[in-house]
Amino acid sequence: MTAATVPAGTPAAPPAPAGRPGRDRYLDLLRTVALLRVVIYHIFGWAWLTIVFPSMGVMFALAGSLMARSLGRPALGVIRGRIRRLLPPMWVFALVVVPMMFALSWQPVKEEGAWWFIKLAWYVFPVGAPPFPWSSGDQAGLLEDTWAVQAAGPLWYIRAYLWFVLASPLLLRAFRKLPWATLLAPLGLTAVIGTGLVTIPGETGNALSDFAVFGSCWILGFAHHDGLFKDVPRYLTVSVASIVMGFGLWWASGHLTADGWDLNDIPLAQAAWSLGFCVILLQYAPSWQELPGRLARFDRLVTLANNRAVTIYLWHNLLILATIPLLDLLWKIPYVDAHLGSAVEAGYTLLMTLLIWPLIALMIVAVGWVEDVAAKRRPRLWPDGRR
């Protein structure tokens, strides 16, 4: 398995059944594709997927658009509602993962003193990065010793999302006064702190870098909601977006890491490529009250993914790891061990891909209803829009 700790997926506004007025199924479809891409990326680790579909930028842009729409109401109530929907699913995740970490010999770091215990509170309110052990258990155990790193990997997004939610009233006010400057400011900030020009150490630096890298995408969501690009000729928008994307690829070509063209490791390239990509997606965005044509067959899947986006996002990395001991049971079947062992080994990641979806489905049934409770809705086990 090729492991990666950069997540993807996004907390979304409380989804509604298909066809409800005001629900844009095009945006719902984009969110579903983004979640699918994130899961596949974390199984195979294909760097090129970050170029083909920059899921994180897309998710932040969609969330920014929804946030701008919500801020037509009093800001304090909107922020409270967003936090209320976000935190309970994370608390359930933490109630499972944190005891597992301690059970596998996780110990406080003496050098950090009381600060180590204070950081545990970030599993409750993740304004900072929740701590986790870099090695937990042993390599010969049921889960590989990096399982905690993989399980906690998606939590950076929760932190970034929370920062954006808290900052949105000020960001939206700035955007409506100086739209273009506000839209491009995070890209400029990334050029400073995401390239080594200025280094901010520790988790503070990581948090600021994430905020800068995806800030333009979040604010682009404001632009989409407010119709900033409606009066701009489409050819001009696409041309400028393509130049920005080209710059991102050019920058990446000179700053490749051990993972090659994985834009998750190249902040400025990620910021530029994601912004340009999202501009084009939203510039050509239709407004669908229902999925058209052949896409209609995926309506239930899209509805389910949007209703359980937080659950899928939080748990998918841990569930990917869970496929490994389950698949290893195949070697306990004598016929498989004797005749199919090499075939199973050659197709291991494909088998992981097939197995992850039933596991995600089980997790949706087991804990997904917490998203409904958090949104003050009636709990549902399988909210795919079927009546």
Residue ranges and their predicted role:
Residues 2-387:
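Alpha-helical transmembrane segments and their immediate juxtamembrane cytosolic regions
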